Design a protein with these regions (language model features):
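N-terminal secretory signal peptides that target proteins for export/translocation
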Residues: 1-16
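Short, contiguous, well-ordered secondary-structure segments
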Residues: 3, 31-34
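Bacterial N-terminal signal peptides
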Residues: 20-31
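N-terminal small/polar-rich segments of proteins
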Residues: 35-151, 175-219
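Short beta-strand segments and strand-loop junctions that repeat across beta-rich extracellular domains
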Residues: 157-159, 198-199
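Acidic/polar, low-complexity extended loops/arms that serve as protein-protein interfaces
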Residues: 158-173
């Protein structure tokens, strides 16, 4: 099994916009006091998967013959909730320290950081058959000392510049492993996720942190 934990444009919808690597997105962060998606085509080749969450590395672009590089950087998504708004039920939009805006497929500007986090990957097999599974695993809670916030308070919307289809769907963390989508061999799928904190619980002041891990596996 290949297992990755971690980050001419031809799409089913429009033209010119397909080893083992790891990426982790660290969700941190409560100091309490257009977007569109792409499914692109890649050629068959040796069995491999590539996954990028936030900042990633590639030797050039896929279209220019580039190949994936490992990038161990962990990006942080955060929000500071004003004391007057804590537990109000008004969702708080989160931002990221990721600066990744372009796709390594062809340097197309897919995402708009810091509001959006790039998430994308590809699956390749010699015969172009088989399917990879993209999933995300979260702990039950974010913590600040002995105080906690359910990780399910964090959700995301999905979109990307140039295509309105959420090919990596919107959702919320579930305190376990959540399957996001299947990726067929020969496809590069990418999206931009915008995260939000539901803010429905009154909690003590503090910085609440936790980490989620995105995984792309191919049997």
């Amino acid at each position: 099994m290949l297992h990755a934990t971690r980050p001419s444009r031809t799409n089913y919808r429009r033209p010119y916009r397909a080893a083992r690597l790891a990426a982790v997105l660290a969700m941190a962060a409560f100091s309490v006091a257009s977007a569109h998606a792409w499914v692109l085509t890649i050629t068959a080749g040796p069995k491999a998967v590539f996954l990028q969450v936030g900042i990633g590395s590639y030797s050039g672009t896929y279209q220019s013959g580039g190949t994936p590089l490992n990038n161990a950087q962990v990006n942080v998504v955060s929000v500071t909730v004003p004391a007057s708004a804590v537990g109000s039920g008004t969702a708080q939009t989160m931002t990221s320290d990721s600066t990744q805006s372009v796709s390594f497929y062809d340097n197309f500007v897919v995402c708009n950081p810091p509001a959006q986090v790039y998430i994308g990957g590809w699956v390749r097999t010699p015969a172009g058959t088989g399917t990879g599974v993209l999933s995300v695993t979260s702990p039950a809670t974010l913590t600040s000392g002995t105080t906690t916030i359910p990780f399910s308070q964090i959700s995301w919307t999905s979109t990307a510049n140039g295509n309105t289809t959420p090919d990596i769907p919107a959702g919320s963390f579930n305190g376990g492993t959540l399957t996001l989508r299947n990726i067929a061999a020969g496809n590069w799928v990418e999206n931009c996720h915008t995260f939000a904190y539901a803010n429905t619980t009154v909690v003590a002041a503090g910085t609440y942190t936790g980490r989620v891990t995105y995984t792309l596996s191919l049997p």
